Amino acid sequence: MAAKISFYKRFLLIVIFFILIFSGCSSMVYKSAFPTLSDGKYDSEFPYKGSSEELERIGESVERINCIAFYKTYVFNSGTDVKISDITEEFLEKNVNNVSYFDKTSSGTGTIIYSLNNKIALLTCAHVISFPDTIYSHFTDEKGKFTKYLESISIRDRQMIYVAGLPYGGEVELLAIDNEHDLAVLGHTYPSLQDLNFPVFPYPKGEAKQLEWGTFVYVFGYPMNYKMVSKAIVSSPNMDGHGSFLIDAVVNKGFSGGIVLGIRDGIPNFEFVGIIRSIPEESEYVLEPEKLKGNINYSSVVPYKGDVYAIEKEDLKYGIAKVIPIDVIEEFLNANKEKLSDLGYDIDKFF
């Protein structure tokens, strides 16, 4: 019996010995293959291990934002010579030729940065939820140049912001906005829902000024209303002295406001380094026929003889996107700390 116990002890010691040897070799191979993963900097190489679980968790805090603005349009007859300075509520009631209505929509991405005391707050870009209060349309002269006389004036009547997936239809309010830096915080209070808990972005804020040429990042967004994650490389780090940078992600409309994540010393060390601001674009005017009712298509063999309209078309320049750095985001939140506090939000608990 004693001999049998002694055999098992020797066997166990041998197993432990080989485990230590192989773990040591594994560590040496790891350090040899990824020598810079412990340098305290943001990684520039593709992650050495899977990150699907972490990215899925992060994605739970990323939401689609939809915004719609409703306008009332007053149309004037040619020759009435109405100028902007003439416009008053009383003038519109007396001199308008006819009234019509239309709406403008936009969509983008927001990230949940706060969920406490039945309140929720999301960070996004200001342009996602911003529409002009008034839109002017001017008559043209015989040379096609715009005159000072108004053809119509469209006044924004109301605006609604929705976050897909939130309770009660997902309507939220604008809590704070900075149009210059293109930042906004949206939120809502759910007094009837006790112990409400939304998935807040689960990783720490980073330092965008520490990003370098070639730093690897992940980005989240909602192009074409689909949640997507993509990868990108940083260029022009800290190009304005405030931490702003460019990425080469192929992003589409709907990515605005989407988070950009750096990785410091390997998975799962994600850090929030910014949000996507804009995609460069150029616009041009193209001629289009009048739209038929029911979206019926015109015949390609019958010559068109109807009215032609000049429509402005946008041409997106894919493969380059501007990013608002976390440094600017923190300045924005601190500047609105008192306002947010009055609304019941504690920015020290954001993120």
What are these regions (language model features)?
Residues 29-43, 143-146, 153-160, 272-351:
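C-terminal cap/linker of serine protease catalytic domains
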Residues 113-178:
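Catalytic-histidine neighborhood of serine endopeptidases
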Residues 111, 250-276, 286-290:
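Catalytic nucleophile loop of clan PA
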Residues 125-130, 221, 273-282:
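Short beta->alpha transition motifs characteristic of CBS
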Residues 1-78, 347-351:
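N-terminal targeting leaders that route proteins to membranes or the secretory/organellar pathways
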Residues 65, 110, 120, 124, ...:
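Terminal peptide-recognition signature
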Residues 46-52, 94-125:
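A conserved glycine-rich beta-strand in the N-terminal activation segment of trypsin-fold
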Residues 45-54, 61, 111, 140, ...:
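Active-site substrate-binding loop(s) of clan PA
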